Amino acid sequence: MGTKKVKISSVKRAAHLKSKKTPLSKQQQQKQKQKRDQLKSKREQGQNIFSQKARKRDNLAQRKKHNKLASLGLDPLEEDNEDGDDEMLENVADMLDGDDLALLQANKRKRKAKTTGENDPDQGQSIGLERAYASDTKKEQDAQKIKLDLLPIKSRDGQIITRTTEVDYIPKPKQKKKNEEEEEDDSEEDGDTEYEDSDDDVVNDVEAATAAPVQKLISTTDLLIARQQEIERQKYRIGIICSGLLEKPEDKMRNFHALYELMDEINPASRQANLMAVRKLAIISVTEIFKDILPEYRVGQVDTKMQTLRKATLDRVTFENALLQQFKKFLQKLEQITAQVNRRGGLRTPQTVKLATVAVQCMCDLLVAHPYFNYVQNIAQLLVYMLNCNYAEMRTAVHQCFRTVFSNDKRLEMTLFIVRRINHLIKTKQNNVHVECITCLMGLKIKNVNLDAEKENELKQKKLESHRQRLLSLSKKERKRRKKLTEVNRELEETRAEENKQAKHQKLTEIIKMVFTIYFRVLKNDPTSRVLSAILEGLAEFAHVINLDFFSDLIDVLNRILEDQDELGYRERLHCVQTIFVILSGQGEVLNIDPIRFYQHFYRNMLAVQAGKNHDDFAIILRTLDEVLVKRRRNMSQQRLMAFMKRLLTGSLHLLHNGTLATLGTIKQTFQLTSVLDNLLDTDTTIGSGRYDPELDDPEYCNAASTALYELALLARHYHPTVRRMAVHIAHGVPATGEGALPTEIGKLTSHELFTQFDSTQMAFNPTIPLPKAGQPKLKRGKHLYIRSDFKQEYGKLLQQGKVSQTKDKQTLQIDFFSALQ
């Protein structure tokens, strides 16, 4: 049975399958096949009978006819050619039965019309002229040139000059159409038909294979046009391939090969260089495909030869194995691209760096989307080394990726793996790494961790187990023993229900140990490292989970850094002070440590932040103020507390409005917690002793009680309305109700919320600035004042003589002297 190969699109194929008749059962198909075989054998037998009998009858009839025509003097060949076919059909019709005759009539072909004029010399000459003309026209078209319009240019005189150029005419190659027509009877109309998807031509890039290579000199404009056309063509091709993969990935796994060819520098199929834009598109497209079709679970290895599987399970396992192989091949190609810029002696051109950046970003996307799929740990290991590369854009991408993984990882397995690899990298490089290797650890969620809870749970479980064993060995009454045993089993089950939490807590504890190992190694071995600022920031962030045994040594190290290193910046100093006060405000309260020297460091660096590039660093001061003025206010003397209030309000004058609001919020909270600061609202300077020295760095001896908060008068006329209301509120003694009270929506905000909500770095002013009122400005007529008293008289004489005329322009602001002197 012949098959008909028809190329149709997916839409037509779906419509054909939809409108196709209901498929036959197996028995009906077997009967139909037997019927076709019988019909075919009968046809062959009929042809054999026809060939044997017709040959004898034909020879006899021809001999009789030849003799008759020869007796009449005619040429027997001409008549034979005309009537031979008709006599043959008549003779055969007599021999065949009804079924064979119907079959032959259905399959007979019409006789071809006899060509006339073969021996006519004029007609042959005309045919030769036509062929010569066609060949000459083809040669002219081959050598023909067409005109292309170029971009116009503008001359110095301002004239637009159009430009054209001539390029050789290249005819489009004609595609050969192969139409296979086979004759079938009516019983074969419902047979199977083989269809070929039209997307195969796009996947195999038939258009590029059939295009004739052009080897000639071309202009820059033609080159750019050809490049853009190639990009658009490959865009369309990539879209077709990706849509097929997303539609049914089980049947389209071979399409990955076409995308991998576009990722290479040289296309293996066409042996031509791929454009850089096409390579980037191919990498991004494959990444998006894997993000969609990869499963959330880890694919296991199943040996289909040793195990007997069901058909559905076998199909799934086959698909997963093929998908895993394609994913592995894709990761190998990405690793080859990044190795060109990461290894020594690699090709580090701007194009390869950009391509490697795209590859790194794609690996980051895969790590975030599927952190526990196969081979993803290899991605994480490669990205850890890219975190210390020499390209800031790649480091930023990996840094953001790791922070996202740390915040979204609930199982903590990938987080622990990444932290271990970072620790190994820093140890191998001897702390000579980029800052991103340390700052990415700030995304870890280890703020609410109790390291002593693990030991308590272990002791509790051991006690319950021993108590259960004692109850089982007792020889009391059965009912009483069963009752107690039930209660103990219930408590034991509750303890076992927390095993998952304990396993997670154990991983979190391991992460904390690894992080502080990194921090303490840098502080001990290389305190002058360029990552010291990031180390101190991390210590300030996670100081509440540091073990109590390390507190004394850590405070001594930080104090030595503050005093010995003169080149230490204000940011590092603020982080040191913040870390120390976080330690002392928590479990470090039991330590006998006097933080007076750290008060002086903090008081000295409070004015380092201003409304400029470092204004965002004021958040560090806010966090430290929360530890110093709020949590440790009872451990501070009145003089020190007043000195901090005065310096804080002085520093608010050269901050942006959100920093000023955060400062006033801290002062308001401190005023509400203590009544000692009410003396600063009194302008009587005889209360304190001595004179206030604002330049003294020791807050204990600057005599802040001898001054007042005069800055509130300036802030009451601030450009921001909320600052004005807050300053008036503090000046009235922070009343809850009455005159000077704040609205509820402002009074409930903390200093950190005020600093964030009123931030205008995104070009959004809070509250919204009202629009100006619409209207035209009124022109005010001015009044002239004469310096010379006799000027009016002299000008009046000129008017009388007619030498000065009256002005008619009423829209100007000039003085009309004529009307003024009338």
Curated annotation (Swiss-Prot):
Encoding gene, per UniProt annotation: Noc3
GO biological process, one term: DNA replication initiation
Primary location group: nucleus
Comp. bias intervals (Basic residues): 13-23
Pfam families reported in the protein's UniProt record: CBF, NOC3p
GO cellular component, one term: nucleus
Family label: Belongs to the CBF/MAK21 family.
Location of region: Disordered: 1-86, 106-142, 172-199
Compartments (UniProt record): Nucleus, Nucleolus
Phosphothreonine: residues carrying this PTM: 193
Organism: Drosophila melanogaster (Fruit fly)
Record-level Gene Ontology MF annotations: chromatin binding
Name of the protein: Nucleolar complex protein 3
Residue spans of biased composition, Polar residues class: 116-126
Ranges of compositional bias, category Acidic residues: 76-86, 181-199
Residue positions, PTM Phosphoserine: 187, 198
Keywords: Coiled coil, Nucleus, Phosphoprotein
Coiled coil start-end: 445-509
Top-level taxonomy: Eukaryota, Metazoa, Ecdysozoa, Arthropoda, Hexapoda
